Amino acid sequence: MMLCIKIFCNFERYIVMADFEIIKCHGSGNDFVMVDTTREKGFAGVDRSVFARAVSDRVSGIGSDGVLYVVRHDDGHYAMDMYNPDGTQAEMCGNGMRCVARLADERGYIVDGILRSGGRDYPVERAESIAEGIATYAVDIPIAVSSPDFAFFDSSERWLGKVIESFDKVLKFSALSLGNPHIVASVDRVDLEKLEALGEAVKQRRDLFPNGVNLSLYECRSEREIFVATYERGAGITLSCGTAMTASATAAALLGIVEAGERIEVKNRGGKVACRTTIGDSITTRLEGNATFEWWGRASFEGGVLKFEKSEITGEEELWQAFRQKIAEE
């Protein structure tokens, strides 16, 4: 039986023929709907931004933190195009990239160990499982400590552990670009209400962040462990954000809060990942974590009407939730 959803309307049931495959997946609780556009001809002509808004809605849609589109470039390389719940396109998504890496790996799409996003190449590979039965993938993310995405300091300089006076007179932020812009601040304790207020405030400061920004607070729990919470540009507070966890781990390494070159556990409200920052002539941080496929299904989207059905429940989510519970008890 297929579910038919009109945007802003209640669920209705119809028996219809689905047009393309969808996969519900997540990385560390950061959940997505994924569409392989390279083989799903039924998706041709669908407006990706409108589809992302409809699908991501947790009341009238499937519910997700965005949509991952698997695409193929003319030179044969495959890429991830990620759209936020508000329909905007993100340059990069670390949790989403791991999910795409898994699908690409299983379907033989990965060329020279590379996937693309936002015009950049990212090395990806299957990694040692973080727990039994949990598919785990790694992506190496180059880090820039200067970027035109930040208008409050000269792009040739670094902004690490400094107060942005015109934004918040207390928190010491580090500004990093991972293909998408991030500001992160170390705190004694992550306060979600404070994070929400900061996230709402930062959306109004295009004078400081012309392209918007992802904002994170992180707390150092030991030399090898931090906890991160993020207000994502285009999504709000999520259970986790892969590039934000990477940015936080990188900032902590650059500031000497954690040791560069060592494996750091990065916990979040959705679970945990691992990061390792390499600092040399350039800065790269390796992000490792789960790529969980919750279910496979079929869908169509025409005239603003989303229809979908689940065809296979994988059972992987049960394994992830058991792992998540174990983390909570540590």
Q: Across the structure, where does each feature detected by a protein language model lie?
A:
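A glycine-rich beta-to-alpha transition motif near the start of alpha/beta enzyme domains, typified by
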Residues: N10-G133, I183-E330
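Feature of Fe-S/electron-transfer and energy-metabolism proteins
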Residues: P123-A127, G133-Y137, F152, S156, ...
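Generic structural detector for well-ordered beta-strands
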Residues: E125, D140, V163-E165, R276
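Membrane helix-loop-helix hairpins that form the core translocation module of multi-pass transporters
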Residues: T136-A138, P142-A144
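Active-site glycine-rich loop that binds ribose-phosphate moieties when present
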Residues: S146-P148, F152-L171
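Internal active-site segments that recognize and position negatively charged phosphoryl groups
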Residues: K162-L192
